[in-house]
Amino acid sequence: MRKAEQDSVAIDDQERDLVGVGMGWWHREVPQIDCSGKAVVGRILHLHDVILREVDRTLARHGLKYPAYAVMATLRVQGPPYAMPPKALLRTLILSSGGLSNLLRRMERDGQITRSSDDRDGRGVIVRLTEHGRAIVEPAMRDHADTERHLVRVLSAAEQRAMVQGLSRMMGRAQP
């Protein structure tokens, strides 16, 4: 391979693995700092951006953004009557309570959900997926699952299982 081709391959590899490049800088400039955690954490953070970009592209075809999709899909997979209290929704989503309240208000205005008092507890509220919301989210759920499978197809089944185990263990330790 000629020098120019080797340089081109090296640049392509660097662009694909920005974390590895950054770690090289750390090793060179601050070798006294153990930055080995960056090998995993940095790649998870980078993948977060890559995954969200792909998911957003998929959901945009359905006129959705991820937070509204996550609420509707979570309600849908509860089964009939496709309902949950906001506190239960909040525990399953990565949103603040204020963020969820604003999102639910917009979704109710758009006819995707309804909010009503909880029959079991007059003080509580129940969020329900509407037929309109269900008609939007069901095809989006299929496309979202396709996108997720597309994103992980570069990994063998064994690699996927190993990642699930390792990431689950990390997530368990990160819980407050």
Predicted region positions:
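N-terminal helix-turn-helix DNA-binding core of bacterial DNA-binding proteins
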Residues: C35, L45, D49, R53-S96
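Short amphipathic alpha-helical segments with heptad-repeat character
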Residues: K38-V41, L45, D49, I94, ...
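Short amphipathic alpha-helical elements of helix-turn-helix/winged-helix folds
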Residues: T74-Q78, G166, R173
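Short, charged, intrinsically disordered terminal tails
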Residues: P85, G172-P176
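Short, hydrophobic-biased segments on the C-terminal half of alpha helices
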Residues: P86, L104-R105
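Charged, amphipathic alpha-helical coiled-coil/dimerization segments
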Residues: R105-Q165
